[in-house]
Amino acid sequence: MSAVRRPLGVLFAALLLGSSAQAQPNHMASEIGLGEWPDDVLREDMDGDARLDLIVPHWSAEAGRELLVYLQDAGGHFPAEPSRRVEIKPEIIAFALADLRPEPGRELLLFAGNGVFSLSSAIASYTDNLRPLFDWPLAASVPDRRRVLYLPGLPDMNGDGHADLLLPGRDDYGLFLGGPDERFTLAHRFSTINQELDPGEVPLGGARLDTQLAINERQGIVLNVRALGASAFEGFLSSWQDSDTTTLLEAEHWQPAAVAARMNDDDQQDIVFMNIGNDLYGQINILQQDAEGGFAATPDWRGPIDTRGDIRLLDVNGDGRLDVLRILDNSNEWTVQFHLNQNGSFRLDQPDQVMRFSGYDLTLSVTDIAGDGRPALSISYYTIPVVNAVRNASIVRSQLLYAPGSEPGEVFSARPAFRLDENFSAEAVRGLSAQIDLQTDLDGDGRRDAIALAPDGTLTARAIDAGLQFAATPFWQYVPTRSVLRFDVQDMNGDGVADLLLYHSTAMTLLVSTP
Amino acid sequence: MTLLTRLLPALLLPLSLSPALLAQESDTLPGYRSLPFTLPADTERLLLVDADQDGLTDVLAVAPSRFSLYFQRTSATGGGFDFSAPDTAIQLEGSSIGWELSENYPDAAGASRFSLLALVDGSRVLQWPIRERQFADPIDVLSGLSAFAGAGVNRLHFSRDINADGLDDLIIPGAGTLQLYIRNADASYQPPLAVQSDMQIRTNLFVRQGIERDVGQALRIPLVALRDVNSDGQPDLISETEERFDVFLASGSGDYFPQSPSYFVDRLEIRERLGNFDFDQLDFANLTGMLSLTHEELLQDVDGDGIDDFVLREGGKVSLFSGTTTGMDFSQPRQVLRSSGNVLTTFLHDENEDGRPDLWLWRVESISVGDLFLWLAIAGSINVEAFVYPNEGESFARRPSRQLTVALKFPSAVRMLSSAIDIREQARALEEATILPTAIAQIGGVESTRDLLVLLEDQVQVFMGSMDAPAAAPDDQFLASLDYSRNRNEYEIDIRRFIDEFEIEQNSELRRVEGRTPEHRLALPVAMRNGELQVASLNGDVHDDVFVFLQRGRESLSGLLLLSEP
């Protein structure tokens, strides 16, 4: 949600101002089937025409795993049937998309258990198409029969215009720098596991729980939960013949994740990961990219952090460097701690700001509403007033906006500049299917707008003024013919005008602006 | 958590330091030998096996790519173990090794030997027989494979007797499939049979914001189901995936299984017929109406001829098909029952105690979106009804003979959420608590009682006869959870009770010995750190043997084996 999207032009607003009960005539409507994994639908330019195409993962008993590519034509239309079908061979575990070959459009990077390959979707076969790029023992070794994983957002670590790969291996990470002619060079290997720590010292996560659900005639269902001491020998001893015979294989292998991100002032991508420090607390580690594009063998900066709660990396103050957020929840009480990035280091023992919220299912994002590089904080949560629930079976969704801080030490203002409490009853449940989108400048006034599903399922857009107030009435609305469960707004054809992607239950509708 | 539970460890610890109050500290237990051991730090597990087939249990230590055997000596050779060095060990090379143990493979001389088997790099299966207490040279069992057994070294239960001929066969995991290799008497293999497998795979290779997440893969591959479904005495193969329900009947001649299923149900086709979920078709006044899109398949003998029949439920329609010795007669259902309402599930169970399985059809009342909103804030109840269609021999009665109602009572969602937080806090508080490792074993010779062993930092305390012998497994009957009886038709499950009574027990065994003096105290050679007690039976006598695992560090892991002396 924090990603900065380029401002969209005024044309869309001019065309959409006013209400409409159906798709605008200046928008080309296309509909395609969503398949089993609607969240995995991708948008990339696959044929090099500067228009985004759709990639839909698909599985069938006959064809196995496929990527269905729907190419957008010059008129903004998507065909009902896929333009290309890319077979995913059984050995493939994951894929990514990058511009690797001189031919226009993006190619596929295919990741198998022991190597990485490239493939063009423009060629219908693997023959004379599949190219081995390099060997790498991936952290995952067994492919899923029905689904192929997608690795999004390949970084350009050194700014040379070529996609790079930060790949987890069996025991460590490898940074592969991309170059011309599909060349990838292993530039750095590092472990995200603290190698200095004696395995005997690694905290074992406190007590284990032994849960037994017993059924007996006297007490009915009896739930017995017993605490077991932390043990370095859990499951260590067993008898060969007592083994579980319902499982052919059970195995798992995990390591802390690493993220490529800009962490200091030098405009280069660095590497961040979290593990257990020598003091047995959680620890954030930063490997900073040096001027020559190299990395040190050990982290340039480390800092201890309490690992309870969700720990996220997010640029909250718009300086282009990722900050650290720690979000703690206790039923309906939430505490958010902001730790600002200080040129590649943090004061993790002392948050720069602490904010507290009361509600359920808190959602947090930052968005540069005014487009001035100073993001506002958006908070959304639900409350369930008992009186409302009993009287008319309804809940309340609250949307709050906090302006950038104006006082010293404030990341965001302590009090919300805007608050919207909406009551949703059982009849208005369609309005709950998607959160309010604050990332798009729909009317082209240089300010983001609030796009939301109204209680009746109508998609509406309201302006947000300089005081972060939502306009009382929408400047645009669209009444879909089918329920919208999720929506995205993106410029699909590069004309600077926002296009709409509406996700229904079994299909999606694309509304692409036309001249 | 009671105050007593909190204080118990603290009470026990000072007691252990008062020699006047306690038994003399010693370095072993009466009737036991104490065998300290130090193993390489990378040892991942110990397996108890009788590798030399002498009736005494040996210890196989498994480390990445290295298998080490410690044989138990017979009393004639001094008994016990020598943990100073393995008696035999082998090193396996490969990035992916799935291993298994078996007694059903002959060695090069044709004698049946305990063997280590390994699927190496997914391409070949090797066997290392144990001969004269040594790993013999490997024997090629099968090669030219294309398999996935996960990265690293993993236990792979891939060698088992599928066709009950006394020879182990092989189940080789592939990409979403299992290849079954039936071994012939001459050590050759029949052409492999490929069956689909719904592997449970959880993979994460990338994180965007949440850096506390890990990357890697968790994998579980279920074994195939084998049982005789057509009453010919030979195990048949039942393969279930999301898409298909396949049955391969064993054949009397030629290859054991046919290459295609003897009969199958296409679950995709059923789902297509029932229709896909569409939000726009959802009846907000009856969300449970979605159950009409569900289906289930039961393979079970209904008519008592020993051959499994097929019960197919599609929404509220239940069809019964007849099993034959050669397959399933899907041409015409023997019976079709239709139920109105929202059918949740069906199963077969003898209700009227006539020895024949009856059909239980469960329905759930209509639930609206309004109900869900209401239950967010206030407690609710859902009635589930069971209709029992008695088995009349060839089929079920047209009308149910009995109707049961189960009221499922639950607290509001808000209350459940707050209870979940309370439970999480209870679990978190355990991080601060001292929980002593304990084990219940038979150290003394009293059959009717058991002894409690408590592992402290520097000693093991033994409280003789302090625990009850394990009770025979209760003869739980069907629906015992509801206090079920044939004379009662109204039942209740109250989830609120679970929440109200929820408590995590700590040191519960120690309550039984509160105030008691341990009969034995065993001094430990090194301090215990995150250790554990494990009970085993290694030499066949009536006394349990005890592994005392003390600590594992960068260089080694250490412990103590208390081995009873017969």
Residue ranges and their predicted role:
Chain B
Residues A23-P566:
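Beta-propeller-forming repeat regions
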Residues M1-R6:
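Positively charged n-region of N-terminal signal peptides that target proteins for export
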Residues L8-S18:
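Bacterial N-terminal signal peptides
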